[in-house]
Design a protein with these regions (language model features):
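Core alpha/beta nucleotide-donor-binding catalytic domains of modification enzymes
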Residues: 2-108, 118-122, 127-130, 137
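Aromatic-acidic/polar surface patches that form glycan- and anion
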Residues: 6, 121, 125, 153-157, ...
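Proline-centered helix-kink/hinge sites
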Residues: 43, 76-77, 109, 156, ...
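Short, small-residue-rich loop/turn micro-motifs
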Residues: 73-78, 168, 289, 313-314
């Protein structure tokens, strides 16, 4: 089955579909560094760098050689949608979503998968959610939605995403994946995710070097399957001693509230500061790299550690500068979540 990814980023959702046996025909994104990463890791896929609003369906058909498209996937912003008052088609926040609708209308795939932040479900008292459903229902799709937690699907991170799935009328019901891990006590932990990676916090390690040990968990074995012997994207940030001493004040699983009272009143700190817990999944990975701390070492996680928390295999290499790499990882849909969704469509 063939897939077109309209807001592909570095390709987390596409990778999940690929792991489930789908063919990724094309990725489209305006972020050059993310698209470079997408192309490097999806070598058989075509790419278009540009604004989806200016890319026509004919452009897409030409690039993919007229092949049939079975699934359109992507995560367009939907915050501008509301049923209250007149539809503001010129609202710039609506244009990317409407471009997604346009491509689905023209390509008429059997399925579409639209992902977004969980808050989209309740935004404007549910009006945005209702508008999303209406737009695709008018095109002949049966649409349903669900908020899925990545941790239920083997990802060592508590990351919730709103997933809308549409099935062309007459092609069957909408299905969602069943959690692979039901109980929180069985979630994949931070330690299970990254304990085989060098964790030194007193030295800047080279960009590429060997693993600290053989795989210490089933998850690590999965992440290292097919990976080269040298590890990429594991450049450790060298913090100043003052920063390291501050991080050291945050206990495992703690946050800024655990800082001493005299520190809070005299020093700069960030309310987003959180230290991961070795025996729990990571909290939601963001696009920056200054708010979360390693569960053991007095530093921020590396790009590779964040990628592990997102379920990117070690064979997946991120391009661009370090800030761009962190952004790509933080913006991505965890591949294992994408794979679980894709497998349901394939049944």
């Amino acid at each position: 089955m063939n897939v077109v990814d309209l807001f592909c980023g570095c390709g987390g959702l596409s990778l999940g579909f690929e792991q489930a046996g789908f063919d990724i025909l094309l990725g489209i994104d305006h972020d050059k560094a993310a698209l470079d990463t997408f192309k490097a890791n999806h070598k058989g896929s075509e790419i278009i760098h540009g604004d989806i609003q200016t890319i026509t369906t004919n452009d897409i058909r030409r690039i993919i050689g007229g092949k049939n498209v079975d699934v359109v996937i992507g995560g367009p912003p939907c915050q501008g949608l509301s049923l209250s008052g007149p539809r503001k088609f010129d609202d710039p926040r609506n244009q990317l979503f409407l471009s997604f609708v346009r491509v689905v209308k023209d390509l008429k795939p059997t399925y579409f998968v639209l992902e977004n932040v969980p808050g989209i479900i309740s935004l404007f008292k549910g009006e945005v959610k209702n508008q999303i459903i209406k737009e695709f229902s008018d095109l002949g799709y049966v649409v349903d939605y669900k908020v899925l937690n990545s941790a239920h699907f083997g990802v060592p991170q508590v990351r919730k995403r709103a997933i809308f799935i549409g099935v062309l009328h007459g092609e069957g019901p909408v299905k969602f994946p069943t959690p692979l891990i039901e109980s929180e006590k069985d979630f994949i932990t931070c330690q299970q995710a990254v304990s085989d990676l060098h964790g030194l916090d007193d030295d800047v390690m080279p960009e590429s070097f060997e693993y600290a040990s053989s795989p210490l968990s089933a998850y690590q074995k999965l992440m290292r399957n097919g990976a080269p012997s040298k590890l990429n994207n594991h450049l450790i940030t060298k913090h100043q001693e003052k920063v390291k001493s501050t991080i050291a004040l945050v206990p495992e699983g703690g946050n800024y509230k655990n800082l001493p009272e005299n520190f809070v009143s005299t020093r700069k700190f960030n309310v987003a500061w959180t230290r991961y817990h070795s025996q729990k999944p990571a909290s939601t990975i963001d696009t920056g790299h200054r708010h979360h701390f390693h569960y053991k070492h007095n530093r921020v996680p590396t790009v590779r550690e964040n990628a592990r928390f997102q379920s990117f295999p070690d064979s997946f290499v991120f391009l661009g500068n370090k800030t761009e790499q962190y952004r790509q990882v933080g913006n991505a849909v965890p591949p294992l979540l994408g794979e679980a969704i894709a497998k349901v469509l394939k049944k």
